[in-house]
């Protein structure tokens, strides 16, 4: 059984992440920036008692602080903002599609790593990246047909989802630069802290200050649930599983995440993908798997 504990932990983490979109649906009356503020604030409060000793022993350099700020802006602010906004446009795009488009993150991660870290890029990468992007189009638009009655709304919703994939994928590169110097728990805490600090002036500058007092008790409960379950808890379970699982196996297991989200969307929201979207989904996930494998092969050279 010990041989299976790692993969089981990764699948549990993937399942928790899949629930994230469904939980956020209950917060549709709140501005996305307000959701970001509270989920990071709650995460910060919950995380602090467990890592304050690590914080006392850590001193960040000027370069490391800039990396934390950059990661917070990309991942904490824009990534979460665009993802939450995309989920709010359920009249144009299903939750399943939003989650599937997140699998494009490795394309942005590898491209940014090539630019900023000068990592090698295999020539075969372009072929699989083009396939992934083509599949993403058919995932977004059923049968490849753009309904011009709702086409603009669908495109905007898809662009928000792609924007989230870009922000999170690119921040992976900067996180890699930071994690080489700073403990993961400490960098996560500072990312949450900086995100909270950044969102405060944005809330008031754009007239959302009053929304801080509008969440209901149940919405506060959902915000806390996001911070604990699909946020930190999922991440801790994932890292525990990753420590006991080879990279090759974990890469495959992580690809179960969008399909778990699709199943949950079908069961809870009665959303069913068309045959063309299912085919495109498998093509998208397989091409991303090949891209990740190519990156592993290049890293070993």
What is the predicted function of each stretch?
Residues 1-11, 106-166, 281-301:
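Juxtamembrane helix-loop boundary signature in multi-pass membrane transporters
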Residues 34-45, 84-118, 247-266:
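Specific alpha-helical transmembrane segments that line the substrate/conduction pathway
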Residues 18-30, 42, 81-93, 101, ...:
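Juxtamembrane C-cap of transmembrane helices in multi-pass membrane transport proteins
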Residues 51-54, 105-130, 258-278:
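C-terminal transmembrane-helix exit sites in multi-pass transporters
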